Amino acid sequence: LQCAINNSLITVVAYDNHKPVGMGRIVGDGAVICYIQDLIVIPSYQKKGVGRMIIDRLVKFAKDIKFQDTEVMLDLMCAKGREEFYKKCGFTARPNEKLGPGMIMYL
């Protein structure tokens, strides 16, 4: 786990009185592809703005690494039932008119 966090482009941790209550991180190439790999919030802190705060910080990071005319793709796969949260944060569901459904392979 520590190796994964160390190799992330950014890791954001939300605290309440020095207790970690949520975490999110981005992996990618640091230029055009950023992927929100994890967004985890302790259940008792869900629906209180913690996840949104973490997402906002991750989105800001991705915007800040954007090169002059290069589009940065910030991508994620959300847990089933969490689609509306990410739509409220500005993400677009796939598939859509521009993108296919995406694929995954577990190794």
Language-model-derived ranges and their functions:
Residues L1-T11:
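Active-site rim helix/loop that mediates acceptor-substrate recognition in acyltransferases
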Residues A4-I5, Y15-D16, P20, P43, ...:
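OB-fold and OB-like single-stranded nucleic-acid-recognition modules
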Residues V13, K19-G28, V32-Y35, I40:
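Conserved beta-strand in the GNAT
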Residues G28-I36, Q46, Q68-T70, N96:
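A conserved beta-turn-beta hairpin within the catalytic core of GNAT-like acetyltransferases
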Residues V41, K47-A62:
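Conserved acetyl-CoA-binding loop-helix of GNAT-fold acetyltransferases
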Residues Q68-L107:
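C-terminal "cap" of GNAT-fold acetyltransferases
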